[in-house]
């Protein structure tokens, strides 16, 4: 695409203000990078990065992009683990970082937030009104509410306990790819029945429009109780989760696990005594103190079905925070000392143990690398297993990085198909398009392509993500 950068810079400056347009190479490279381990290609590097402040500026930007046929890539925080954030073609990156207003309406039962707010910022504001944000990404310090809702990710939250983000969305302000600004949903706390365009945009991964205002129901801040359980093996934790669903026991809000290796790494990193085996961490909630305490005691009794070495309610918040931090530190250790090639496996509950064993075999038998170490953790109660191939070096070729990413992606997605899963956390386009086709068929994929074309006839927004890439 032949673009006059000088003219582009001036044109964009008229829309968002020249101080909010960057076309220098260092900035463009930063916005092209994401969590993927391989090098950038020239096509990933945008012509310009713009930071609009409102829906009207975004509307003008998208109308301009349609006129010039220049792709626009939406950027929240760039934390996608399936390549959603890396531009697939040269174009304009639309950074939502300036859009950080939030308004809380307790008398109406909802709040409205702009997409550039980090999750932790929204939580802090809602806490002033004794309300909870029902979004739980591990990257809450940097993840934005716009990106989280656009992917509809549950992250740490167990879907069966509270639901997904979209279950709390009442409506949006959206700028369509062609520049029109629309309103969806309701200002009542009762969501629309029937055809509700709001649902088109929840989980749409930025393909159908730019979310510029998100209206969500206020959720009263519950009381929490935290539980930790130590087991000889990861299989004991898996058996407990399977039995929980079989008995119809209401799941905890959080139900995390560290396998034997991850538990050792994580606990050592935070200064805790090394556990004998695997570790499970749970958080239960209720809207009364007595209710949460009773729920925790009952769940603690249930946990003995899996014969834990020890299971206890952690009443000291500092102790709990240290235990909880061990999960993140297990991942940080791997990132510091080598490279990880990961997966998101969300099988049918009764196939959870089989999926775990198959994931171990995938890492053990990688064709592109011998002797990779298997390490796993994740949201086992959801259920989601993050199975990783850990390689204790960063000194591998760019081609090998791609090959390992692709091999882990394809083989773990085959497990999702084999065991009835989909992907409850990372989204379903970009690197997952081949899985989407295999799971749901070409007919459904073509329906999505036609839907995208109806909303975005010039394929302006997030071009390439629906086509798939590696």
Where are these regions (language model features)?
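C-terminal substrate-recognition/cap domain of FAD-linked oxidoreductases
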Residues: 23-34, 229-231, 238-403, 407-414, ...
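Short, ordered loop/turn segments at secondary-structure junctions
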Residues: 76-79, 99, 138, 260, ...
